[in-house]
UniProtKB/Swiss-Prot annotation:
One of its GO terms (molecular function) is zinc ion binding. The keyword Nucleus does not apply. The active site is at 141. It comes from Xanthomonas campestris pv. campestris (strain 8004). It comes from the Bacteria. This is Protease HtpX. Keywords: Cell inner membrane, Cell membrane, Hydrolase, Membrane, Metal-binding, Metalloprotease, Protease, Stress response, Transmembrane, Transmembrane helix, Zinc. It is an enzyme of class 3 (hydrolase). One of its GO terms (cellular component) is plasma membrane. Its EC number is 3.4.24.-.
Amino acid sequence: MFNRVVLFLLTNFAVLILAGIVMSVLGVNPTQMSGLLVMAAIFGFGGSFISLLLSKFMAKRSTGAQVITEPRTQTERWLVDTVRRQAQAAGIGMPEVAIYDGPEINAFATGANRNNALVAVSTGLLQHMREDEAEAVLGHEIAHIANGDMVTMALLQGVLNTFVIVLARVVGGIIDSALSGNRDSGRGFAYYIIVFVLEMVFGLFATMIAMWFSRRREFRADAGGAQLAGRNKMIAALERLSLNHGQNTLPSQVQAFGISGGVGEGLRRLFLSHPPLTERIAALRASNGTAM
């Protein structure tokens, strides 16, 4: 956690330096932009971290996940015992364990930190996966928590949000001034239209970057699951997913931390949070279960 806070501070500092350089190159007075930078950081990081802090509550509410407080069946007992054993092996606090009603084979992890997390599995997973395959899926989710992926994604999203807000307004101001022929003119309706369009365009590129990082993170979680449950079990779980790949019904806020993502070709692949299952299986076979 400490390393990620340091990374956050260094990244924030780098954002401010880069923004100042860009504004100087574009002929914008950086001293006039301090308010914009503060506003961008507040909105950019604020939204990401509020979502992170509320992630467990929102995930349980949006999926209808029922936390297992006292196991009532053999399956629930096995789930809790397996998560506890893997959490101890990964050096994290015991997450809450939940089951949500969903026909697809899926599971997800969420939470604000390594010691305050949630692991939930679908009823479809419990119905269609063997116990060894489900063990590997749980290991994958525990690896997400142990790697601090939720915090890292929140940091990255905050940086990207800040860039989008700042660049859209800086570039929008330059375009507006060029069109009006007056650098000192007030901001009119056209300026806000330009900024709105630029935020959508820059937001698409920011999403591509975030999803690229998310796909790399999935390979690491697969490797972590292989270490906790066994490489062959992890491969078998992914192969089972490839045979029973249905529509992902997880809410958008937890899809990135599910075991299974969407399917897409061409440009759509750039916006997927998960790599193709064939690539994940191939990476595991080539890695011998080592961390990636």
